[in-house]
Amino acid sequence: MKKQNLIEMEGVVTESLPNAMFRVYLDNGCEVLAHISGKIRRNYIRILLADRVKVELSPYDLTKGRITYRLRTKSNG
């Protein structure tokens, strides 16, 4: 169930951190710290550097987010 008040943006993974955390550079020029959502974790979807991802941001803290989807690129099928 998707929450209504979340901000969804696209970006590129720039750094992989411990505990399934990633630094994501968003299309608007901001950089956020994001963790993986439960569905991605459960389905063993790998997030690598330079992957394009969709990130949900809370309107209360725009520096942290949740990666909800890894977008397809030409190189990964």
From Swiss-Prot:
An example of a Pfam family matching this protein is eIF-1a
Q: Which Gene3D superfamilies match?
A: Nucleic acid-binding proteins
Which Gene Ontology MF annotations are present? ribosome binding; rRNA binding; translation initiation factor activity
User: What superkingdom heads the lineage?
Assistant: Eukaryota
Protein's cellular compartments: Plastid, Chloroplast
Q: Where is the S1-like domain?
A: 1-72
Describe its assembly. Answer: Component of the 30S ribosomal translation pre-initiation complex which assembles on the 30S ribosome in the order IF-2 and IF-3, IF-1 and N-formylmethionyl-tRNA(fMet); mRNA recruitment can occur at any time during PIC assembly.
Q: What's the protein name?
A: Translation initiation factor IF-1, chloroplastic
**Source species:** Zygnema circumcarinatum
